[in-house]
């Protein structure tokens, strides 16, 4: 063992060899290193290796001074916030990887590597550098897979580099998450790095010395695949599975998987994924004799360790090697549950795969595309994805079961392009950049405003899949303007006037139009310094270029045909060059084509910059600058054709120029078309907004337009049959009827002209909708299927607030933009702990969000519904459409009585919980809270409250959840166990309840407050507190004092509000505001009965109970307007919040949120949206009248 003494005289063990290590050395070598040493010394076949020790890691952290910086980043981190966790990890890893390795440690690693090379008889041995955490393989908490492994590392300096990367992998998002969850101090867990000779495996896999699925201790399970073991360990390859009887070594079961891909080393020593040869795809990887030989080694390993082991193995040149062994940490303790037999279950089997973790669970399907969507999964859901990774741990902990396939259908061909903030990039280029951690933005559509916007790309995926080749066509259906997309890819499409999600195959089958865009917004302005030279840049580059030497621009060449029509233009370009210090001289004249040149530095650098960045400049330039640039191209090599359109000609190989022109024209709201003449010439042409360009051209005059009689083509065409179905009730001289019936497109301007001549009820509303469409950035195009094949497809995931904004714009071969949604995609892994079925191949295709399924993790079966239910009939599959979300300024929340309905309530899309009733949680316990305190103690009541509140807070996180303290009347508590002593009141609704009772039973109130405090400390910062039935500010003051006693500072640590349920509270609302509150919630149920003196539970008078009584509404209006004046938020949580006609008034008065019952959320959201629109319209009308 190499021991270094530091400046303080402490002994530092930097390097340890396997013969120096045993299982007792986890604190020195980490789990992997200690285990390898144990196996080496037990005489097991292990490749030679050395370990860079945990002391070395600590030395590195100390000498580089990184500890304080890391602590600062981790301070206050909420690990349940996926974005925050990921960002913290990136910052820490960057700090570690960019730090300078201490020289003494660097030399120690190099010396050890050179010694390993001597042992292996190689000049530079190829090694694997594997992280080995000091808490990694402890039985209490599986840390496996949380740190990194690097294969095919060669050379001493590279080993040093990748050891440092291993150090940084101690702070991956999932490692940070696990340590927080398991209560490990981040700096008490150290990391070692194992540097081991890499076995170039012909076949490899894993072995479990106990069947981890059935937990049968008499069985040993081997998984095997072709090539390196990386595919099996990560789960990206479906392995063969062999089950061996440990007593007889009889092979009792085999599952021979179809193995599509394998990991191999290429000639450069790098790992790559290749296709398995056809004759090996379904061939058994290990022979029966090899299975038994490996099983014997496994038995020896288990015997040596004295416990069930999880072993990684490899096979090279006729010999097995053990790469790693660790205890199986996932075996359940205690009595096993009785397993259901497949034949006993009366349910339809939807899928079969390989059982990966035992157990049976029923729940709602939630399909996850990637780790950014893990918050979608709630407690008890069935997580369905292509493949899972340890990064999905937060979602897995909530899931009742997990179902995976080997890869769902991602979306777009690799050569298709998207427009990013770096210009046009192919999908396969974007994939590489994103996977390398590059930040990119992509053009997309805002589903609410129908305006284009830039969106951040947060992930990318790829695989192979079936692809449709679709062509964009207009009048001529024979199109070469194509793109390849998977048939189940979803597009935003108008169906019956609503923006909807429709699969490509359904679009084709039903001849639906899709959306294109006619405008690209600027990302940011940064080329104002080029404003004066944009025209010159376009003119020169239209048919010229910049000569470079060693990449630097040294001269400008400008080529033009010497015609009478171009003489003035050429002279003006010469004059413009002189203005920036250049001087064009003629250097050649062939067939009347003259080439001019200037070798001056400034024009060469300026025009050279424009040439290099021509494809991205339009993204960052103003419209005036872009118009000048394009005008230069038009004058230089363009014309105004007889078809009354402008044409620009470019060599088809000048891709950057073509793309710059395309982007520039869209930036100006001009829709360009691209056509190729033969293979060498590209023509970019357009015939709308011609004046924008022609008023800036110098050769082609604007007044030439007068020579053309043909009107400009109306480019914004829409499919009224899909977007404006209400037009079927209107017509103008048969035109609209024909357009609608035959699904023809019509120009928006022409449609406006027709409708202006129609005088009929309802037409004004349609005109308003058309106005919005005219101001939008969308129009309709038609597509058709022209071919089909199988090949690579790619997908990106964009950051968005809601699912309809998870879209982006993809471009065809001829640069026609089409709006598409994100599709299903994720990364692979196998996961433990909950019922899990892997290798189904088609889970993400067969299962749908919202389906109820039962997962049998041992049998590897997914059943339809609950296992006792059998569906008699299958519904005919139709085009499935989803309505776009309605966005409102007024929040629409939901009332929740019981934690059990939290998932259903959250699924409504509500903006939060406006009222979470404490009393229903208490009643659900079946025992009086006083009895719980007396018999079980304070902790029992706190835990019971936490459990209920947590379910709701978790389901809605990060949306707010407003918890109302206990408000149960005495008659409700009397029925509980221990409730015999509840006082008998003639009218409990006017009796001992609400804040009166809370302040009389402070010990129960404190339990509620302590439960909330602990939950907020767990990370549920979305919980708010509200007190009921207040009548005087003194009550608020007293509750605040009690909150401080339990460690909660109202209005500072936690949002704090009151229920306004009494006329007293409504009338003196300003006094409550002065006392200090964050929000008010109107409880109209009680407010109504107290205002009009009617007991709503009394059948004799309940018919007179009216929430819209003028006196009640007057009090409500007074509260809302008073609070608004003081900046206090208002909400309503009574039944009135579910009454549309009352909600209209609330919105008009300015209420901040409305909390409705679960079944009324959708209706109320529509009422709120309609009312908000009406309020805005009335304001506009009023303003207009006042101006007039």
UniProtKB/Swiss-Prot annotation:
Binding site for substrate: 917, 964, 1061, 1083-1086
SUPFAM superfamilies for this protein: Glutathione synthetase ATP-binding domain-like, Hedgehog/intein (Hint) domain, Homing endonucleases, Phosphoenolpyruvate/pyruvate domain, Phosphohistidine domain
Annotated pathway: Carbohydrate biosynthesis; gluconeogenesis
Residue positions binding Mg(2+): 1061, 1086
GO MF term set: ATP binding; endonuclease activity; metal ion binding; pyruvate, water dikinase activity
Function according to Swiss-Prot or TrEMBL: Catalyzes the phosphorylation of pyruvate to phosphoenolpyruvate.
Similarity comment text for this entry: Belongs to the PEP-utilizing enzyme family.
Protein name according to UniProt: Probable phosphoenolpyruvate synthase
């Amino acid at each position: 063992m190499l021991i270094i003494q530091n400046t303080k005289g402490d002994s530092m063990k930097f390097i340890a060899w396997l013969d120096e290590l045993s299982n007792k050395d986890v604190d020195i070598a980490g789990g992997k290193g200690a285990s390898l040493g144990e196996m080496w010394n037990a005489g097991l076949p292990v490749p030679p290796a050395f370990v860079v020790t945990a002391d070395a890691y600590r030395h590195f952290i100390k000498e580089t001074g990184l500890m304080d910086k890391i602590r600062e980043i981790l301070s206050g981190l909420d690990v349940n916030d996926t974005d925050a966790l990921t960002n913290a990890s990136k910052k820490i890893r960057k700090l570690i990887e960019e730090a300078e390795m201490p020289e003494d440690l660097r030399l120690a690693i190099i010396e050890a590597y050179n010694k390993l090379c001597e042992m292996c008889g190689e000049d530079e041995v190829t090694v694997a550098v594997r992280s080995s955490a000091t808490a990694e393989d402890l039985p209490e908490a599986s840390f496996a897979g949380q740190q990194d492994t690097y294969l095919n590392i060669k050379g001493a300096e590279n080993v040093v580099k990748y050891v440092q990367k291993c150090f940084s992998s101690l702070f991956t998002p999932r490692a940070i998450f696990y340590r927080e969850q398991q209560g490990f101090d981040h700096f008490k867990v150290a990391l070692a790095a194992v540097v081991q000779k890499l076995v170039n495996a012909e076949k490899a896999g894993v072995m479990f010395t106990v069947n981890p699925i059935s937990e049968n201790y008499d069985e040993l399970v081997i998984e095997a695949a072709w090539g390196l073991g990386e595919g099996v360990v990560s789960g990206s390859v479906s392995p063969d599975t062999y089950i061996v009887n440990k007593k007889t070594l009889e092979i009792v079961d085999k599952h021979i998987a179809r193995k599509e891909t394998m990991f191999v080393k290429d000639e450069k020593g790098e790992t790559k994924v290749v296709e398995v040869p056809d004759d090996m795809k379904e061939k058994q990887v290990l022979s029966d004799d090899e299975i038994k030989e490996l099983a014997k080694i496994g038995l020896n390993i288990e015997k040596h360790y004295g416990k069930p082991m999880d072993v990684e193995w490899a096979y090279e040149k006729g010999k097995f090697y053990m790469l790693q062994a660790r205890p199986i940490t996932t075996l359940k303790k205690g009595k096993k549950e009785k397993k259901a037999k497949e034949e006993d279950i009366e349910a339809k089997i939807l899928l079969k795969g390989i059982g990966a973790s035992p157990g049976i669970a029923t729940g709602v399907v939630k399909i996850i595309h990637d780790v950014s969507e893990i918050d979608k999964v709630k407690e008890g859901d069935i997580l369905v994805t292509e493949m899972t990774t340890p990064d999905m741990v937060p979602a897995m902990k909530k899931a009742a079961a997990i179902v995976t396939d080997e890869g769902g259908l991602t979306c777009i061909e690799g050569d298709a392009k998207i427009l990013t903030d770096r210009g046009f990039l192919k999908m396969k280029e974007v994939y590489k950049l994103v996977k390398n951690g590059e930040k990119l933005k992509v053009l997309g559509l805002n589903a609410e405003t129908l305006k284009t916007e830039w969106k951040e790309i947060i992930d990318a995926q790829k695989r192979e899949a079936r692809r449709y080749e679709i062509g964009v066509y207009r009048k001529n259906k024979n199109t070469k303007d194509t793109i390849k997309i998977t048939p189940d890819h979803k597009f935003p499409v108008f169906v019956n006037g609503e923006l909807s999600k429709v699969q490509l195959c359904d679009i084709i089958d039903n001849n639906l139009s899709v959306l294109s865009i006619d405008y690209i917004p600027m990302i940011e302005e940064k080329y104002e310094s080029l404003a004066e030279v944009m025209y010159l840049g376009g003119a020169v580059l239209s048919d010229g270029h910049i000569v470079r030497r060693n990449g630097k621009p040294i001269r400008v060449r400008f080529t033009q045909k010497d015609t009478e029509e171009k003489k003035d233009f050429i002279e003006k370009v010469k004059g413009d060059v002189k203005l920036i210090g250049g001087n064009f001289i003629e250097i050649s004249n062939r067939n009347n084509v003259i080439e001019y040149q200037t070798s001056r530095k400034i024009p060469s650098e300026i025009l050279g910059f424009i040439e290099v960045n021509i494809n991205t400049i339009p993204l960052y330039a103003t419209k005036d600058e872009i118009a000048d640039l394009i005008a230069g191209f038009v004058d230089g090599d363009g014309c105004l054709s007889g078809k009354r359109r402008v044409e620009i000609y470019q060599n088809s190989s000048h891709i950057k120029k073509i793309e710059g022109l395309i982007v520039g024209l869209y930036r100006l709201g001009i829709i360009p078309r691209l056509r190729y003449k033969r293979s060498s010439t590209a023509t970019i042409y357009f015939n709308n907004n011609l004046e924008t360009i022609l008023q800036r051209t110098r050769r082609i005059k604007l007044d030439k337009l007068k020579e053309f009689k043909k009107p400009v083509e109306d480019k914004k065409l829409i499919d009224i049959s899909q977007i404006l179905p209400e037009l079927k009730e209107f017509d103008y001289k048969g035109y609209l009827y024909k357009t609608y019936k035959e699904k023809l497109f019509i120009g928006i301007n022409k449609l406006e002209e027709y409708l202006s001549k129609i005088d009929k009820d309802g037409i004004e509303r349609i005109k308003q909708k058309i106005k919005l469409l005219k101001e939008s950035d969308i129009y309709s195009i038609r597509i058709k299927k022209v071919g089909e094949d199988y090949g690579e497809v790619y997908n990106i995931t964009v950051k968005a607030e809601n699912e309809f904004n998870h879209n982006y714009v993809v471009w065809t071969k001829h640069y026609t933009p089409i709006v598409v949604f994100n599709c299903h995609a994720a990364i692979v892994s196998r996961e433990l702990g909950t019922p899990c079925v892997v290798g189904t191949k088609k889970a993400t295709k067969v299962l749908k969000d919202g389906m109820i399924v039962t997962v049998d993790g041992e049998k590897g079966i997914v059943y339809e519904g609950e296992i006792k239910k059998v569906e008699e009939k299958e519904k005919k599959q139709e085009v499935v459409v989803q309505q776009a979300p309605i966005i409102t300024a007024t929040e629409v929340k939901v009332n929740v009585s019981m934690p059990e309905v939290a998932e259903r309530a959250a699924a409504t899309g509500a903006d939060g919980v406006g009222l979470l009733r404490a009393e229903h949680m208490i009643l659900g316990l079946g025992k009086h809270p006083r009895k719980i305190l007396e018999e079980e103690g304070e902790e029992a009541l706190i835990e019971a409250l936490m459990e209920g509140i947590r379910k709701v807070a978790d389901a809605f996180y990060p949306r707010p959840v407003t918890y109302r303290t206990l408000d149960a009347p005495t008659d409700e508590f009397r029925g509980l166990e221990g409730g015999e002593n509840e006082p008998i009141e003639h009218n409990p609704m006017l009796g001992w309840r609400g804040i009166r009772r809370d302040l009389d039973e402070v010990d129960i109130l404190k339990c509620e407050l302590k439960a909330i405090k602990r939950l907020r400390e767990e990370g549920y910062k979305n919980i708010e507190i509200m007190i009921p039935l207040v009548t005087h500010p003194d009550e608020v003051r007293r509750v605040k004092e009690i909150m401080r006693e339990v460690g909660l500072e109202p209005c500072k640590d936690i949002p704090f509000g009151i229920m306004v349920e009494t006329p007293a509270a409504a009338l003196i609302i300003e006094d409550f505001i002065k006392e200090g509150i964050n929000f008010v919630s109107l409880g109209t149920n009680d407010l109504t009965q107290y205002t009009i003196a009617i007991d709503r539970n009394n059948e004799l008078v309940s018919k007179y109970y009216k929430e819209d009584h003028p006196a009640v509404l007057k009090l409500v209006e007074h509260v809302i307007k008073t609070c608004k004046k003081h900046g206090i938020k208002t909400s309503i949580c009574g039944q009135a919040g579910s009454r549309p006609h009352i909600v209209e008034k609330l919105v008009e008065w300015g209420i901040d949120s409305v909390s409705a019952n679960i079944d009324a959320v959708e209706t109320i959201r529509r009422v709120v949206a309609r009312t908000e629109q009406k309020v805005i319209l009335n304001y506009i009308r009023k303003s207009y009248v006042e101006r007039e």
